[in-house]
UniProtKB/Swiss-Prot annotation:
It is a multi-pass membrane protein. Required for mannose-6-phosphate-dependent trafficking of lysosomal enzymes. LYSET bridges GlcNAc-1-phosphate transferase (GNPTAB), to the membrane-bound transcription factor site-1 protease (MBTPS1), thus allowing proteolytic activation of the GNPTAB. GNPTAB is involved in the regulation of M6P-dependent Golgi-to-lysosome trafficking of lysosomal enzymes. LYSET is thus an essential factor for maturation and delivery of lysosomal hydrolases. Keywords: Golgi apparatus, Membrane, Transmembrane, Transmembrane helix. The gene is Lyset. This is Lysosomal enzyme trafficking factor. The keyword Metal-binding does not apply. One of its GO terms (cellular component) is Golgi apparatus. It is found in: Golgi apparatus membrane. PANTHER family: LYSOSOMAL ENZYME TRAFFICKING FACTOR (PTHR31925:SF1), TRANSMEMBRANE PROTEIN 251 (PTHR31925).
């Protein structure tokens, strides 16, 4: 009768999947020392950067089209709004008149917030996850300021006894 394999010496899923062959090196050791949240954080950062590279390529291809449409919009003679003009056409015309750098800033702030959140998930201390997100950061700063004011008020109420 065949003997059941003994998996007691195999410590992680990589060695279980790979059989008896063990991967070695500093990257593998660092990966094994991370907990699940950190591993998923690094995978999320990698996928986010990969998707970002694809999106930036697409955006810069679109940039040429955007510039062409914006120039066509500017070169047209301003006409009186017609009754047949829909609100979507009017909105599109107004949005095309915004400069490209403004669109970049509008999309860059949430992009950086998401990246910093994913990066904070890679930290070893779970209490530090999300500290770099703007609303959380502002709440922490305000809370620290209130605690400082409260402590300084308590100190000023103490009467010093001169001996």
């Amino acid at each position: 009768m065949p003997k059941a394999p003994d998996y007691s010496e195999l410590s992680d899923s990589c060695t279980l999947a790979g059989g008896t062959a063990r991967f070695s090196g500093p990257l593998h050791r660092a990966w094994r020392m991370m907990n699940f949240r950190q591993r998923m954080g690094w995978i999320g950062v990698g996928l986010y950067l990969l998707a970002s590279a694809a999106a930036f390529y697409y955006v810069f291809e679109i940039n040429e089209t955007y510039n062409r449409l914006a120039l066509e919009h500017i070169q047209q003679h301003p006409e009186e709004p017609r009754e047949g003009t829909t609100w979507t056409h009017s909105l599109k015309a107004r949005l095309l008149s915004l400069p490209f750098w403004l669109w970049t800033v509008i999309f860059l702030i949430p992009y950086l917030q998401m990246f910093l959140f994913l990066y904070s998930c890679t930290r070893a201390d779970p209490k530090t996850v999300g500290y770099c997100i703007i609303p959380i950061c502002l709440a922490i700063i305000c809370n620290r300021h209130q605690a400082f004011v409260k402590a300084s008020n308590q100190i000023s109420r103490l009467q010093l006894i001169d001996t």
